């Protein structure tokens, strides 16, 4: 008896050393220098922990996000994937319990016209696999990791959805403002056209100048039509993202938007714990880890206990009434012999899949760092450009007024006026784009740090 206990203990240690029962250990280290030196974090706060309602305070945008969270088809599919994973986990947990079956049978027979005899069996059978070699345990752990992955994926879809809705909303506001500027410019150019025609009538300019002004007016009016089309297309895209049919989108104004949180990014470990896609990739790695352990357990025998209990009136060649209680119990051990090659192949596949999952996780972390760096660079660049663009527009407005005055008195050419006005329009449109870039950078940083989870 003592020798058997020692043998069992040695076998258990051997199995543990093979990794059959070993639990997955979460990745605790990240690549060094995940952030560039000029944007390295100085504290542990991260805007990724802010609720999306606290970040996006525009009531119209909040309403759109709520509609998207309720109706977006991709997010609803992700929620269904979570339900599927929950059911799979329940199945793996139930595999620890014995399986029960009821198999009643009855037979009537008569030999040589003798009186018919009736026999019956009413057994209840039970079968239970004893999880000595970790097959069921690893299957349950793998299913649990799959559930966690599906939950993280659902959160990643939600984060992406909120960011996409916000970016499309701000795109609409940018287009609205550019439409206003271009429309106002078209009106001013019509005035310039009338002025140029009057100057030509007075002999102070040429017909070529009038033709050039007309061409510029048509060009600006064409830009207005292009902006109208782009606005409609963007509205349609946003409506589909909300899970709704194309429609007009109620919205505010670009000038009224304010996203001014402290753009703190937190330490890399925080970012890792916040981003749902990173968590999803790590849970996929855990799944692959337990898949490898399951493949190893296939090399070991399986122990199954089975038994039955019930009533029968058939006792061999005798029939007794009333029936008697019948009990039976069987224990069996099945050791794979001829499918070892298949098991080896499955283990190689599992190891390769685990390595693939590891590389995918590493790449996901690198992508996360890149997205944070890109968003911060975009925010810093946009802020600097806005300040410079303001001074540029002030100078261009002075230049337009000066050249128009000079042309009225015949002291400059029409080309200088045309150039100044076109440059001013371009700068005004670029200023709107810079403001959009600043808003988009905050949205992208919020998403990159795992924001939108709550």
Q: What is each model feature region?
A:
Residues 7, 19, 23, 259, ...:
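Acidic, low-complexity, intrinsically disordered peripheral segments
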Residues 208, 411-433:
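Short terminal targeting/anchoring segments
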Residues 145, 152-267, 378, 382, ...:
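Periplasmic alpha-helical coiled-coil/stalk elements that build and connect Gram-negative outer-membrane
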Residues 39-67:
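Regulatory alphaC helix of protein kinase catalytic domains
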Residues 1-16:
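Sec-dependent bacterial lipoprotein signal peptides
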Residues 76-77, 93-94, 130-158, 208, ...:
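Sec/SRP-type N-terminal targeting helices
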Residues 18-36, 66-131, 233-249, 262, ...:
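A small-residue-enriched
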